[in-house]
Amino acid sequence: HALGYNTITKQTVRTSSMLFQNEWKNEHWGILLGGRFDKHNLINHLIFSPRANLRFNATQNIHLRLTYAGGFRAPQTFDEDLHTSMAGGERIKTYLAKNLKEERSNSLSLSADMYYNFGNVQTNILIETFYTHLNNVFAQRVLNDHDENGIRILERFNANQATVWGMNIEGKAVYSKWISMQSGLTIQRSQYKEAVEWDEDAPAEKKFLRTPNIY
């Protein structure tokens, strides 16, 4: 209930899941296969999300990993949708489009995890590249319409497809059991396959809005 705006969002979310996986491994190799079944009360069918992982220990201090995973986001109202924001001096609130479908993802990543000791200092560097393909990706657009409270409507709808790809680097140094330092850097690109018009007064964009390329 948004006090002061006379708006109420009522939503009941239930998810039942079953996870299974099996792993085969030896000193140098590891293979993991598995998946998850989800039944979300806002989706009328069962969703299967597979996963697979291939690990290779090149040496005792260098570990390589190739991972695939599927996933989804349900067509539901999220926490950030409960806030009434401002756009062009006008109140605006997020609503879900009719027949909104779940967003599906397929992700692939390749990483190298490396360890080295400099005297008493233990160090670890992780370098990872990733690629994610999204189907029925969620996007938002401002409609030239208002709800019963006079608040302009920001609609979440299914755009066609999108991709997110990039690289992640993380480093850690442990000086003692009391002192350690850790830092990371992610460089990525997020782009719709087809340009999305989020406002009739703004040009259509392929890039994700409010999504940093470096962080």
Regions found by a protein language model. Give the residues of each.
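Transmembrane beta-barrel strands of outer-membrane/channel proteins
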Residues: 1, 33-37, 66-70, 79, ...
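Outer-membrane beta-barrel translocator domains and adjoining extracellular loop/strand segments
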Residues: 1-7, 43-50, 77-83, 90-91, ...
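Hydrophobic, lipid-facing positions within transmembrane beta-strands of outer-membrane proteins
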Residues: 14-20, 35, 48-54, 64, ...
